[in-house]
UniProtKB/Swiss-Prot annotation:
The active site is at 137. The gene is atp23. It comes from Neosartorya fischeri (strain ATCC 1020 / DSM 3700 / CBS 544.65 / FGSC A1164 / JCM 1740 / NRRL 181 / WB 181). Residues 1-23 are annotated as: Disordered. This is Mitochondrial inner membrane protease atp23. Keywords: Hydrolase, Membrane, Metal-binding, Metalloprotease, Mitochondrion, Mitochondrion inner membrane, Protease. GO terms for cellular component: mitochondrial inner membrane.
């Protein structure tokens, strides 16, 4: 028998060279978890484990996401405020066009002017994370209606709405950065978080050449876009 190729399955219990063992039973799951904890699973194996877990938990993840989405639409002050302001501009975001789905890329959500908001149910850590993500995407929706954002070709537009969404959604507040992302700074923390996340978002767009290009575009619009807190009177949280 020939040696197993990288990423292929060997003859020992289905285990691959990545350290990941396919299977949904409890024993196999524990073996995979211990392989991760002891450093015996490669990054490729960890990704295989994550994908299998997300597929296995898809129905439960989406149900939890939908329940939390509906609760936030009814009771969250920031979500209700953004919903009201979007409605005043002629838009409508509610459970019929805020979708909870399993995503294959590592992102929390997205906004599409034609279809609405996508929430990646398999990436949501808790209801607070879902609230931040909804608020972020709803700021994009507000900007689309209020400022006629060119999502396709204008990187300055993209940078501006990313700055505003990261700043106003709450995802860059100190507690979120400190406890979830391990950012320990006390001074200028909010601004640095907003800038970092805006650069990452712009960098991922097709028209952006590289990180230096993304940083340049963000810097060009930073002052005016960071100061613009509409529809809030100030940064809400």
């Amino acid at each position: 028998m020939s040696d197993s190729q990288p990423g292929s399955t060997s003859s020992t219990g289905g285990k691959s060279d990545s350290g990941y063992i396919p299977g949904d039973d409890t024993w196999t799951q524990w073996r995979n978890i211990f392989a991760i904890l002891t450093g015996k699973m490669t990054d490729e194996g960890k990704e295989q484990f994550r994908i299998a877990r997300d597929i296995r938990n898809e129905a439960a993840d989406c149900k939890r996401c939908e329940d939390q989405r509906d609760y936030l639409l009814q009771y969250s002050p920031i979500i209700r405020f953004l919903s009201d302001n979007i409605r005043q501009l002629g838009g409508d975001l509610s459970s019929h066009n805020i979708y909870c789905r399993r995503c294959t890329s590592r992102k929390a959500g997205g906004f599409d002017p034609e279809y609405g908001i996508l929430l990646c149910a398999n990436e949501m850590k808790d209801q607070g994370h879902l609230e931040d993500t909804m608020a972020h995407e709803m700021v994009h929706a507000y900007d689309h209606l209020r400022f006629k954002v060119d999502w396709t070709d204008n990187l300055r537009h993209a940078a501006c709405t990313e700055i505003r969404a990261s700043s106003l959604s709450g995802e860059c507040r100190w507690a979120r950065e400190f406890f979830r992302r391990g950012q320990w700074k006390f001074t200028q923390q909010h601004q640095e978080c907003v800038r970092r996340r805006a650069i990452l978002s712009v960098r991922a767009r097709p028209g952006c050449k590289d990180e230096a290009h993304a940083e340049k575009v963000v810097n060009e619009v930073w002052d005016s876009c960071f100061r613009d807190t509409r529809p809030f009177d100030e940064i809400y949280r």
